[in-house]
């Protein structure tokens, strides 16, 4: 029960969202009316092609013309997520990306290494360098990432030169 969850959430943030393309305006209002008092944030989002192997437009018949938050669709060189997140799968394999459902971006295994070791691993840092050096397009998975064109909350491209310099200095100091 969502009402119970919200009342007992503690420090957990409850976020409600739904794709707006498949529901009517009346259903959109109903969504806000039903869930608005039982969450910290609520929103309607656009469909986004986050997974390269899944064609959202083909599956839904809806042409995607804006980003998930109604922003313009733009290409970026650098993924911000790899600098503040990673995903631990149920089997202990660690991916550099929360969208890596096919497990093509594995950077470690928590059964063999600590999260700190994986976070600071050569594999993970090489991926970060590739992005900071503007070579994301060379990566077989990251190259076609719809998350970065359609869903990006943080664009760090304007800071890419200084971040690259600082990241290289950080790696050299270790």
What role is predicted for each listed range?
Residues 1-64:
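Conserved AdoMet/S-adenosylmethionine-binding subsite of the radical SAM
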Residues 53-70, 164-171:
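Charged, glycine/proline-rich intrinsically disordered loops and linkers
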Residues 94, 99-174:
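Flexible mid-to-C-terminal extensions adjoining Fe-S/redox cofactors in radical SAM and related proteins
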Residues 69-72, 92:
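Short secondary-structure boundary micro-motifs
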Residues 88-89:
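Short, acidic, Ser/Thr-enriched surface-loop or helix-capping motifs
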Residues 80-82:
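Short, small/polar residue-rich loop motifs at catalytic or cofactor-binding pockets
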């Amino acid at each position: 029960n969502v009402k119970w969850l919200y009342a007992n959430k503690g420090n957990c943030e409850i976020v409600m969202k739904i794709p707006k393309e498949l529901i009517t305006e009346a259903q959109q209002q109903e969504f806000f009316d039903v869930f608005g008092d039982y969450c910290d944030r609520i929103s309607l989002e656009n469909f986004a092609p986050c997974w390269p192997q899944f064609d959202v437009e083909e599956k839904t018949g809806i042409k995607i013309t804006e980003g998930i938050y109604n922003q313009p669709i733009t290409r970026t060189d650098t993924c911000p997520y790899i600098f503040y997140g990673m995903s631990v799968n149920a089997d202990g394999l660690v991916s550099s990306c929360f969208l890596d459902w096919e497990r093509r971006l594995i950077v470690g295994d928590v059964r063999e290494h600590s999260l700190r070791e994986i976070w600071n691993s050569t594999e993970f840092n090489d991926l970060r360098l590739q992005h900071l050096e503007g070579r994301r397009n060379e990566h077989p998975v990251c190259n076609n990432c719809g998350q970065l064109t359609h869903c990006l909350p943080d664009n760090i491209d304007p800071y890419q030169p200084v971040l690259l310099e600082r990241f290289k200095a950080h790696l050299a100091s270790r």
